[in-house]
């Protein structure tokens, strides 16, 4: 299940950049399609993350913090795409998104079921 989870968030990150770029270049139809596919990947990420949480959690704060950071990351991804679609500025959101994404990945790698890079 860990591989499904990692694959789904990697694909979701790619789709965020594709959707963002398509909305920026004015290709609304392609952007709408990729955005809907991205939303399906949000659901997959949440379901696989919840399954990992229930199966492997020692019910401590690190797992709960990782889950909270993951949900915030998904929220920021959606906010980036929507604000770009509406033509609003996204500078501050990009900074917050990158910070939360890095924290989420680092915490995920630190937990026992993550890949042990450090």
Swiss-Prot record:
Pfam families registered for this protein in UniProt: DUF1516
Cysteine-cysteine disulfides: none
Principal location class: membrane
Keywords: Cell membrane, Membrane, Transmembrane, Transmembrane helix
InterPro entries attached to this UniProt entry: UPF0344
Membrane topology reported for the UniProt record: Multi-pass membrane protein
Recorded family membership: Belongs to the UPF0344 family.
Family matches, as NCBIfam families: PRK13673.1-5 (NF010198)
Identification of the protein by name: UPF0344 protein RBAM_010920
Organism of this sequence: Bacillus velezensis (strain DSM 23117 / BGSC 10A6 / LMG 26770 / FZB42)
């Amino acid at each position: 299940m860990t591989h499904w989870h990692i694959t789904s968030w990697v694909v979701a990150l790619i789709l965020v950049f594709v959707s963002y770029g398509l909305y920026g270049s004015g290709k609304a139809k392609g952007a709408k399609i990729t955005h809907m596919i991205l939303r399906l990947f949000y659901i997959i990420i949440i379901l696989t993350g919840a399954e990992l949480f229930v199966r492997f959690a020692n019910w401590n704060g690190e797992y709960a913090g990782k889950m909270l950071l993951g949900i915030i990351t998904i929220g920021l991804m959606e906010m980036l795409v929507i604000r770009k679609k509406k033509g609003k500025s996204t500078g501050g959101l990009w900074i917050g998104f990158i910070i939360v994404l890095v924290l989420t990945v680092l915490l995920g790698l630190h937990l026992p079921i993550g890949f042990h890079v450090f």
